[in-house]
Structures are given as C-alpha cells and as structure tokens.
From Swiss-Prot:
Identification of the protein by name: Insulin receptor substrate 1
InterPro entries reported in the protein's UniProt record: IRS (IPR039011), IRS_PTB (IPR002404), PH-like_dom_sf (IPR011993), PH_domain (IPR001849)
A single BP term in Gene Ontology: vitellogenesis
Organism phylogeny: Eukaryota, Metazoa, Ecdysozoa, Arthropoda, Hexapoda
GO cellular component, one term: cytoplasm
Record-linked Pfam families: IRS (PF02174)
Amino acid sequence: MASISDDGMALSGYLKKLKTMKKKFFVLYEETSNSSARLEYYDTEKKFLQRAEPKRVIYLKNCFNINRRLDTKQRFVIVLSSRDGGFGIVLESENDLRKWLDKLLVLQRNIANTNGTAYSPYDQVWQVVIQKKGISEKVGITGTYHCCLTSKSLTFVCIGPDKTPNGEERVASIEILLTTIRRCGHASPQCIFYVELGRQSVLGSGDLWMETDNAAVATNMHNTILSAMSAKTESNTNLINVYQNRPDLSHEPMRKRSSSANEASKPINVNVIQNSQNSLDLRSCSSPHNYGFGRERCDSLPTRNGTLSESSNQTYFGSNHGLRSNTISGIRPHSSNKHSNSPTFTMPLRCSASEESSISIEESDDNGSFSHYRLNTRSSETAIPEENIDDFASAEFSKVSEQNESDENYIPMTPINPTDAIHEKEKVDMQRLEDGSLHFDFPEHASEKLARDFDLDSDNQCGRPIRAYSIGNKVEHLKFNKRLGHLNDTGQNPNRVRAYSVGSKSKIPRCDLQRVVLVEDNKHEFAANRSQSSITKEGTSYSTSSNRQKKSTSAPLLSLKNHINSDRMSDLMEIDFSQATNLEKQKFIKNNEIPKYIENVFPKTPRTDSSSLTLHATSQKDIFNGTKLNNTVNASEEGYLEMKPVGNAYTPSSNCLPIKVEKLKISDYTAPLTTAAPVHDLNKISAYNISAEKWKEQSLCEEKKSNSPLNETPCSLKPTDVESNSHDEHSTNNMECEVSVQCDKQNNLDDKVAENNNLDIGGHEEKKLVHSISSEDYTQIKDKSNDFTKFNEAGYKILQIKSDSSLISLKLYQKGIHKDNLERSHRLTESVNTIPDNATASSSVTKFNINTKAADSRSTDPSTPQNILQIKDLNFPSRSSSRISQPELHYASLDLPHCSGQNPAKYLKRGSRESPPVSACPGDGNTYAKIDFDQSDSSSSSSNIFNT
C-alpha cells in the first residue's frame, strides 16, 4: 500500500464493486495542492505500485451524495452519487464501512467548506430510468435519474447529458414535495415504481413511471418513500428560508409526518421500523452533525399530557430559528408563515398512539398558532364559556342591600319582602343604572320586541332577587305574569305562592283561586266564593282574569307553611255540586246524621204532650220546598260528593206523604179520645230507632204483661177469620178517618217532621231489634173484639213477620230506598190477617202508626207462651255489609198507638218463613199497611204488617 505522505493517499485496500462484485484495489486521496480529493481503484495492488493508470477516478467534488445503501443483498454498501451515475462499493464488515464512509464524508465537507457549496444530505438515493409515460415526456423528465429522498421531498437528479439524442432538453434537477404526492406503488414483476403527483406539485398532476435495477429496489423504494410520506415533513422550509434570508434547516433533526385521514387506503409498510433505522444510520454517516433523533408523531388525537422524560429527545428552537410547517408552501403568502416564539424549555407534547383514530390533528409550528407560551386546551382548569352571559350578568347584580359586598355573587334562597314600595322602586332603578353598562344585543331574537312593551325587571316586583333567564325564556314568563297579574296593586305585600310544576303554568288551578295565600295578618279578611270562582275582600271582587299574586317559577318556600290554608285537601281537585238544583231538597241531610243535624239547625218547638221530651221541627216550607239551610258540617266537606251506592241513596218524595201523615194523625190523637192511657212523645220517630229511655221501666212492663190478652188467650187466626170480620174493619177505619180529619191542621207540622225523621237513621245503638223470626210454622195470636172496643184504641195483630234468609241485609241506613217509598202507598191496600196485642200496642214506636182490627178466633193452647221471646236488649252489634259471607234476617219495629204510658211489651210471637196461606181481600174497604224489607227483589217473600 502506498504511503499517505507521497501524494495525499488516505485509505487503500481491496474492496468489491457493487455491480460486478469483483475485488478491486481502491485508493482514497485527500485534497492536495496538486490534486483534489478523489477515489481510484485498480485491478490489483501490483498495478497501483507500478504506477499504472487507474481503471476509474471518482472526484468527490462531483458527488452530490455519499451515503450507505440498504436495498441491496449486501449489507455493507456505500454509494457515491454524481451526475455521471452512481458507484457502489461493498465492504467486508461494519467497521470497514464506518471507516470508509466517515472519511468520505469528511473529505466532502472539506470541499464544501472550501468552495462554499452546500450538499443536501439525502437519506436514500436510487438510480432509476424514467419512462416516457404520463407527464414525464411533457415536462422533460426522461432517461436516467437519481431519485433522492429526504424527509421532506423527493428529488430527481439527471444522469448523463442535459439533452436527449433527439435534442430535447432534460431537467437537470427537480424537487417534488412529499406533501404533493398523492400515492405511490410498485409492480413487482416488471421492476416498476410509480408516483402520482397532485396539482400542487411543481410538475402538475400526473404519474411518473420509473424502472429500477431489480424488483427488490422497487419494493424498497415503495416502502421507504411511503414511510417518509407518513412522517412529519418539512416541505416548505427551504421556501421560507429564501423569503426570510435564513440558511436551510434541512440539517436539523426532523420529526416524522403523522398519518393522514386516508391512511387506510395506503399500502401497509412492513419495513418501516427497519428502514427508518437504516435511514438514520445513513444520515448520521453522511452528516456527522445530524446525530439527533427525529421525534415521532402519534396517529390519533392526544389522550394525555406527556411527561418530561418523554420529551428528552425533543429539540425546540428559539426566536432565531424558523419552525416547520405542515402545509404546502408553493403559493402560500409570506404573511401566513410567521415565525414562532415558542419557549426553549421542554414542554410535554408527545402523545400516546392510538390505532382506532383515523384523523390526526397536526401541530402547527407557525407563529399564528401559538401565543408566547403554549396553552394546553385539554386541561381541566381551562374555562369553557358555555353559559349564557345573561346568566352571569343577572347573577352578578342579584344581591340584597342587607348583604355584605363579599356576598355579591350569592343568590339568597329566602323570601325578601321590601318594607317600603318606594325603597323597592329605588332599588330597581339603581340596578337599571348598573345594568346600563352591560348591554347584550340579540338583534334577531324576539326579546327585543318585549323590551319595548314590558319591564324586564318585573320579576323583582315581589321582592325576589332578579331571575337569571336564558335566551327565550323571558317571553313566556312575561306572558304568564300578564295573565296572572299582581295582588300587590291593592297595597298588600303578598308572600310567594307554591311553585308550579312543568307544564302547569298555562292555567290557574281552582284550588288556588279558592285559597288566597296572603300575610297572616290579612288572611282572615278574605273569603272564597266557590260558586262565582272569585276572590272577595271587603266587597271588592277580583275575578280570574284580574290581577292577583304572581306565581313563582322557582322552588316553594318552606317557611310559608303557616300562611297556607290549613285544609289538607286544598291541593286536590274539588268537585262542587252546590249548584245542582235537583239536590236542593236533600241538601240538609248529610252523612246519615239527621237526628243530631236537626237538633242543631231547626228551632226547638215543644209539643203539648204529657211527656217532657220535645220534637225539633221546622216549617213544612223549609223542609220540603227546597229552602237552603245553614249547616254546621265542616267546611272542608262542603265541596265533595258522598260516594254512596246510587241505588240505595234516599231522595225525599211527597207521593206517599198524605197517607203517612194520616197514619201519624191517627196514632197521635187516638189516646186523647180515650181516658185510660197517656200519649207518648215522639222524640225520635224512626223505623229502626227506638229511644232507650222507654225501655228502662221494666217493672211497669211486667205489670202490663200480666194484664195482656197475649198471656190470657193466645189464639191462631185462619184465613176465614179475616174474611168474616170485614165489616168490623170498615167501621173501625171510618171512625179513625174522622178523627184524623179533625186534627189534620193541628199536627201538619209535627207529622212532616216525623216523616222526615222516619226517612233517616240514627245511631247504630238504636237501630236494631232483639230477635229474628225464624219459626217454621205460623203462630197466630188474636185478641177478643170486646177488648178493642172497650178501650177505644187501635189494636195491632201480628199475622206474620217473614224473614228471608236468602236476602242479605244491607247497611241499616240504606234501607230507605226511593223505590220502596214510592211503592209504600200502594202496599197499604194489601190484605192480611192481623191479631191484637195490647201489651205490644201500649208503648211501641214505629215508622207508621197503624190501627188493627179485632178478629174472632178460636182459643189456643195456653202453652203457647213458651214460644214467646223476651226482649232484653235493643243494642245489637253491627251487621256485616257483605252480601255473601253471612245471611242475615230482616227486623221490624212497630210504632203502636199511644194507649198506655208504659213501655212496649216484651213478648212478640215468632212468625214462619212461609208466606201466609190466604191474604185478606183488599176490596173490603179497609186500610192496610205493609212493611216490605225486601230491597233487591220485589217478588221475594217479605215481612208484612197490615192494618185492619
């Protein structure tokens, strides 16, 4: 090997040529005063020593690129690219490669420093032949070219002469930005590689087709260029530097381009990582000052902030350096490419990669994208102004004068009642002056029109803080205020009323019209008139459409519970039946409490009887002609309908009134005609209500029992007995009718009240009789006819009291059915056999006063009284209302004429379940009364009591 000191030889040795893979003796010379730096090779070392001519001399000043090649089968290859073509050498090891490559790059830089020439460090250089296809012939790019790749562009350098054999001009060198390349690909069998250019490229849109040495080179070109296109590019850096007179920044470390949105349409590069590493190695060899690693870019939106450790390899530039741009600089104006003043300290900008995202937001390095320091818009501390500015403005000025200045932004949740209306007006005026500096104009919104007609601070008239409204909500609220009005126009300061739920602001509930919620001192002066649906105060009427207190749309105040009506049902829907004309007659009857009700309402009018008990009554006009009476029932129950069964509800009727009054007259005035017995008073005249005081005299009853004809001769009547005594029935009834006619006018009022009481029911303690009549055979008891004429009294004979166990008793207060009352007058003419019972007729109280007849009968066995039941108690337990569970019997109590002052008899005769064998004929002219206990079926057997 020749000495370096001879002629500037630096390195020498046996190396292989890339094309032929033959060993040659290569000698590298430095630049001297006599010659320039060059690379020579000989066939053998012997020829070199003999000073033979070298096979080829490659001057380093003609090489625009010296780099390592990675796309060949050999691992250690160095390529020297020049306008004459590329020359490649193959080394034995990595150390030999690094030694030769470093020396070549040093010599190249020395030449560049001496001549002032800047060499572009290309990452990859391929020698291709551009075919006459696509736009190549039109633009003059045909023949052999070097395809040189950098991180930002793809450069084609002409090899050979500048003209074609046909005399056409060839482009010596052209640079195409990677951002203007739409796509690239290769055809493996034909060793073809192509690129599709966009309209922003310097050549225009079109395709470039080029042929490589082999298919491996085409594949490597495709993968490498595609990887560079996917990385961050610095395509417009050179143009920016030209405008700003700054040197090229291509020697600075680069950052790979991020993936675009249409990354799925691009072929997958399987050798990206390996090629990137090789590119960095080649770059570091060709440019020793570029040993910094490029920063990779994520493929998705950032999901977290980076740490300081992640940004250790990042390099930031001060104000003296321009930053890269991610847009095409071919036609961009200078104003859009301003310089960035980003800080020099490391900021965490690296983001995590994500495969799911198809869109990548690239960071702009221009000055317009940054402030002096970068702002992390993903920070949780960053304010997002999503709220309406009206809300902030109204909340800022909604403060109370009593609060401190430190609580300006606090909205009080308690009622605020101004003590003076003038003070309130001044307060609103001050707030308007403060709001004058804040004007928010919404030209296309409907709230502008309302500002001319309405007061926007009208919500503060009730002393409340100013409500913060969003855009559009004030319109509906002002209409609602106009509809409701304000009660404070009358000089009052009403409190806030309960809040409406969503959707209920369109109407005013009836319960709110009937319930005026005002200050505790003034609430007693108001009266609600349900029939007119208005609110009255000292004679002044405020109808529904007039001004009343404004409803609040906020939450109700819990502190105003004492001002609200105590009626717990006031918030429910009320059904007012007070205007119904067909219910006026029974309006005074309420919840089956007529005895107590009449005592409280009717004036007390004592009867001229021998008893100390009185009957409370009123005039016939007040009771039956529909005069409205003042009741003492709780006012809360006034507007509700009693939910009783409709079929059993009683309605007063006057159809059967004359006949019933006749019977009352007969009963009341039979005793004065006789001298033997006093007359009882009628305190409570009811079919099922017997005064308990009349049953206390048990000793007197025992004395009457000994003289009763029932104890002497119990008898049984046959059907023929009733028929044979029809003439006696005529005479008896004629006498009784004459007596009743004479006393008609005197007892009209008392009879009406007695009829009214008969239609109503008292307490449960006085409603029931003592026994159930369930015998299987008839027991017929009669009295002698001379006993009836002897005392001149109305005798009663119980033919039968039939109890049908198949019928279930309803509640006792529901037995007065309107249907039965209408038919009761027709049943008075039915025929039946009756027997006298003086002991029972002495003091019984019944619904109808019925006279009986004296019938002839045969005497029966004296052993009959063993079937008689003694009446011991009148207070029976309440019966079940069920129609299925327990069959119950019907009971009857008889109001007998007042022939005696003693208690009623204790013995009644059992009847049979059977119907009477033969009934008396109604054509005899006698008057009969029938008590029918059947409420469900008129055809069923019933208990019948008849008057003879």
